[in-house]
Regions:
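A conserved helix-loop-beta module that forms one wall/lid of the active-site cleft
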Residues: 73-148
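Short secondary-structure junctions
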Residues: 35, 108-111, 216-222
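Phosphate-binding site of ATP-dependent enzymes
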Residues: 140-232, 236-237
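Flexible loop residues that form catalytic
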Residues: 12, 62, 120, 136, ...
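Short amphipathic alpha-helix with an adjacent loop that forms part of the alpha/beta core around
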Residues: 46-53, 77, 122-127, 152-155
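ATP-binding N-terminal substructure of ATP-dependent carboxylate-amine bond-forming enzymes
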Residues: 1-85
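C-terminal active-site "lid" helix and adjoining low-complexity regulatory extension at the edge
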Residues: 230-274
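A short beta-strand motif that forms the metal-chelation/ATP-contact edge
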Residues: 54-59, 134, 175-177, 184, ...
Length: 274
């Protein structure tokens, strides 16, 4: 491996996200990572054609795969076939593989919003005024609907969607990790403005909760975001485990936290490249 490994950094700089600036975050990260790596940025639709020229591919704020599902599948297949190093590694069990893991975690009795994907399993869900219906391959709330129990009886998309009870949670909170090392946490105090985040100081129980899902995912390297909600009884429930291209909201943390994250990421990439 050369002293300065080359990275193909995959990002959609122009992707419009409510309350978030994907491009600004990736401009910042690449400006800092250039201290250690030779970098080139590319759009996700160009990654498959370019990836063989670099020591590794770093997938960052590339937007929801739902928008370019076929091209992502071709990129993934080519990377696996050619042994291309992709960061995060393509073995993630969370959102990278679709949201079916929420069914597995529900079945295993883990602290997750109860999730089903078959009409005959609806009675396994807690009673609720409304139920969230989301695509198995969704992201950024794309395709999210809220239906009554009666409306679920007429749902014709079974097999393509997941159903969860709508929970009157206190707030949402996200925990950010590089490899298995916790970096920082952010929360949305107002459930009606979930994109407005503030720094959050987790306690030991919060960290144990978040770390349990990072451990479950078994990724040796990579960036992961554990999204959870604080239930009315005070417990945390997993909303999603984002292990493909989690937005990091680095502009909302203190400078020393942000710099610590950059150094942790650079160290992780060096170890990943061997």
């Amino acid at each position: 491996m050369p002293d300065r490994p080359s990275l193909l950094y995959v990002t959609d700089l122009a992707y419009p996200a409510r309350g978030r600036r994907y491009g600004d975050e990736d401009v910042f990260l690449t400006s800092r990572l250039r201290e250690w790596f030779d970098l080139a940025l590319c759009h996700p639709l160009d990654a498959r054609a370019l990836m063989g020229r670099f020591d590794a591919v770093v997938v960052r704020n590339s937007g929801p795969v739902l928008r370019y599902r076929e091209e992502y599948a071709r990129f993934r297949d080519r990377a696996l076939a050619d042994g291309v190093r992709v960061y995060n590694p393509l073995t993630g069990r969370g959102d990278m593989a679709g949201k079916g893991y929420l069914l597995d975690l529900t079945e295993a009795g883990r602290p997750v919003i109860p999730t089903v994907d078959r009409p005959q399993d609806l009675d396994r869900l807690p009673a609720a005024d409304r139920y969230a219906v989301k695509p198995r391959e969704g992201a950024d709330s794309i395709g999210l609907r809220f239906l009554t129990r009666e409306e679920l009886d007429g749902l014709d998309a079974w097999g393509e969607v997941l159903v969860q009870p709508r929970i009157d949670f206190r707030y949402e909170v996200s925990f950010y990790f590089v490899d298995d090392a916790f970096q920082y946490a952010l929360h949305a105090p107002d459930p009606a403005r979930r994109w407005v985040l503030e720094p959050y100081e987790p306690n030991a129980a919060d960290l144990a909760f978040a770390r349990s899902f990072v451990d479950w995912n078994t990724l040796a390297h990579g960036i992961q975001r554990v999204d959870a909600c604080r239930a009315p009884d005070g417990s945390l429930l997993l909303v999603e485990l984002e292990d493909l291209n989690p937005y990091l909201s680095l502009d909302l943390v203190a400078e020393e936290v942000r710099e610590g994250f950059v150094e942790a990421l650079a160290d992780s990439l060096h170890h990943f490249l061997g």
